[in-house]
Amino acid sequence: QAANLFRSLGIGSEDVVAYVLPNCNETVLALLGGATAGIVSPVNPLLDPAQIAAVLRETNAKVVVTLKAFPKSEVAQTTAQAVADAPNVHTVLEIDLNRYLTPPKSWLVPLLRPKNPVSHQAKVLDFNTEMAKQNTTLDFEDIQEDRVAALFHTGGTTGMPKVAQHLSSGIIYNGWVGSTLLFTEEDNVICP
């Protein structure tokens, strides 16, 4: 469904979907859906807006998945600032973490939710609402050849982060090595 959503937003096999997220269920969906529909670019949510914008520009990201404004988190605000400096981003998909809370906390979030003054021109949509509209099987032919499936940024210790390409085969190999040599069925891992 996530891959179909990204394709419905104009993402082709060589287009980039970036996500600026903490670890949550939707992070895995954005990772796998982005790599299936096009090229996925995970971005560290702890980077400052200028660094995130540099990664978005360097990867030519067209869609960004991030959090909806949430109490005690600045991920949404930081990402909105970055998107303002990344002119090729045409859509921002937001994830509301309130869905993970139970009453009474879930009742308080709408009252405490910080404002997120958006200064960018990208269309803002709800990730889960839009994904629910999609088919559960791919609406497009999956590419059967090895290709760039992910763009990961470096730490940026000597300036702005640089981007490293990862092929589908490399991602699969890393998963195999991890499951064979490093981890057991008791471990929880997001790969790559």
Which sequence ranges carry the predicted segments?
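Well-ordered alpha-helical segments embedded in enzymatic catalytic cores
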Residues: 1, 26, 51-54, 170-177
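Conserved AMP-binding/adenylate-forming
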Residues: 2-50, 189-192
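Conserved adenylate-forming
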Residues: 6-11, 134-147, 151-192
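Structural core segment of the AMP-binding/adenylate-forming
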Residues: 8-9, 39-129
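Conserved acidic residues
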Residues: 15, 53, 62, 90, ...
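Short beta->alpha linker loops
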Residues: 22-23, 47, 70, 74, ...
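Short amphipathic alpha-helical segments
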Residues: 30-32, 76-80, 106, 166, ...
